[in-house]
Design a protein with these regions (language model features):
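Active-site-proximal loop/short-helix segments
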Residues: 17-46, 74-84
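Short, polar/charged, Gly/Pro-enriched helix-capping and turn/loop motifs at alpha-helix termini
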Residues: 18, 66, 166-169
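Charged, low-complexity, helix-prone segments enriched in Lys/Glu/Asp/Gln
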Residues: 44-51, 82-86, 152-166
Length: 180
């Protein structure tokens, strides 16, 4: 861990990097289980998570103005401790142009985690608005039928207009039920 911290910190300093994004796009559970001793199930995962927190703490101490973008690995790294250190600008790998799923993520996360984002794939109002949150990745294809550059510009302007409201109080239009 000490070597990694020093190496990455020096690399970032030498190259003027002030925004760090972490993603690993694998399911590590099987690797963790294989590394565990029979009577110590879960210890490798615990050590990994403790190491992750220590690594990010080192980066934030060395670079106090650094932004850590926690690509949440399919939502698996959205926990209290990572939220203290980072923002998930890509909150989940569930992003395959399915607007109802986007709305469910936004609805639930906005109660606890105001900074998060996902991708916008289409410029029609329903799909695009379903993707909006405090951050959004425009994943448009200029060559896709039914999408024009003008429509893309309109979406971006609409997003710029409403984005400040994502940092205000959150009152969903549907019931919240019991959050405990």
């Amino acid at each position: 861990l000490k070597w990694l911290c020093q190496y990455m910190g020096d690399f970032m300093e030498q190259n003027g990097i002030d925004h760090y994004r972490q993603d690993f796009n694998i399911d590590p559970l099987e690797f963790w289980h294989q590394a565990d001793e029979a009577n110590r199930r879960g210890i490798t995962e615990v050590k990994y998570i403790e190491g992750l927190y220590a690594y990010w703490d080192y980066l934030l101490q060395r670079f106090p103005n650094m932004i850590i973008d926690n690509c949440a690995s399919g939502g698996r790294r959205l926990d209290y401790e990572t939220s203290l250190r980072s923002a998930p600008l890509w909150r989940t790998d569930y992003q395959y142009s399915e607007p109802m799923g986007y709305q469910c993520h936004t609805y639930g996360l906005n109660f606890f985690l105001p900074q998060h984002g996902t991708g916008a794939y289409y410029v029609d109002r329903f799909d695009f608005r379903s993707s909006m949150s405090s951050a959004v990745v425009f994943n448009w294809k200029f060559t896709q039928t039914g999408q024009s550059f003008l429509d893309m510009q309109k979406c971006i302007e609409e997003y710029k207009e409403v984005r400040p409201y994502y940092y205000e109080d959150y009152y969903p239009l549907s019931g919240i039920g019991n959050l405990t």
